[in-house]
């Protein structure tokens, strides 16, 4: 099982196939995705890779994290995420994973945080039909109606759908097709929509319900760490 990647959602556009058919795609950008740490079975009880993406200012990074970045000889990162992997898919600390980690035609699962919409009513939040427009209904046309019976059941059940905060939820969209990959610019074009606002962080993984294509690199598309990479300053 390979590692996933951290990317930023740039927005949506469309590309054309050789047959002239247009395909709506979401553009995802990789921002210096590097391996920051390894988790091993002997030391941690499980196997995983901690990846970092984006460049953070040193003054905004906690001292403990600055020391961690310094040991890994990587610049401070804005986003840190762990991906579970098999022992044979571990990648050396400091290595950069490039966009050709995923190949065109491959299916991926993408996880993002939905756009926040604040406090909304049940009609918008849960697609309720609302109450009647007339015949005794006043003011409460868009309410959710009764929440529980009188004597029976005499209570409101847990998880009753009501008005409340809508959005800012972690959502995974499965089986999205990779349309194009641009290694030089670090772009991955995925067919369809992905949850989240422009500039938001998303996680890309190999689709769990699809077979990994033969051309996919294993353990990943790796760019070796540069010897002169500036590390975080301790202190």
Swiss-Prot record:
- Modification type N5-methylglutamine: residues: 151
The GO terms describing molecular function are:
rRNA binding; structural constituent of ribosome
Its PTM note reads:
Methylated by PrmB.
Q: Got a GO cellular component term for this one?
A: cytosolic large ribosomal subunit
Keyword Ribonucleoprotein tagged: yes
GO biological process, alphabetically ordered:
translation
Q: Which Pfam families match?
A: Ribosomal_L3
Where is the region Disordered?
A: 138-157
Q: Does the keyword Cell membrane apply?
A: no
What does the record give as the function of this protein?
One of the primary rRNA binding proteins, it binds directly near the 3'-end of the 23S rRNA, where it nucleates assembly of the 50S subunit.
Subunit-structure text: Part of the 50S ribosomal subunit. Forms a cluster with proteins L14 and L19.
Family stated for the protein in its record: Belongs to the universal ribosomal protein uL3 family.
What is the protein named?
Large ribosomal subunit protein uL3
- Organism from which the protein derives: Rhodospirillum centenum (strain ATCC 51521 / SW)
């Amino acid at each position: 099982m390979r590692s996933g990647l951290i990317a930023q959602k740039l927005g949506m556009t469309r590309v054309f196939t050789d047959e002239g058919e247009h395909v709506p795609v979401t553009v995802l950008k990789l921002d210096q995705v590097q391996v920051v740490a390894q988790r091993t079975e002997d030391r941690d009880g499980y196997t995983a890779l901690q990846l970092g993406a984006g460049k953070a200012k040193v003054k905004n990074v906690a001292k403990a994290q600055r020391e961690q970045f310094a040991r890994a000889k990587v610049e401070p990162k804005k986003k840190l995420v762990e991906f579970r992997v098999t022992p044979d898919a571990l990648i050396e600390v400091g290595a950069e994973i490039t966009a050709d980690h995923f190949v065109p035609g491959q299916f991926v699962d993408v996880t993002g945080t939905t756009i926040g919409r604040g406090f909304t009513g049940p009609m918008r939040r849960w697609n309720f039909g609302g109450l009647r427009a007339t015949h005794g209904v006043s003011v409460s046309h868009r309410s959710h109606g009764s929440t529980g019976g009188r004597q029976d059941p005499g209570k409101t059940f847990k998880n009753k759908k009501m008005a409340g905060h809508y959005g800012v939820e972690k959502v995974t969209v499965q089986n999205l097709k990779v349309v194009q990959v641009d290694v030089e610019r670090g772009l991955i074009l995925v067919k369809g929509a992905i949850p989240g606002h422009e500039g938001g962080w998303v996680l890309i993984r190999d689709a769990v319900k699809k077979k990994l294509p033969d051309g996919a690199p294993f353990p990943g598309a790796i760019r070796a760490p540069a010897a002169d990479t500036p590390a975080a300053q301790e202190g």
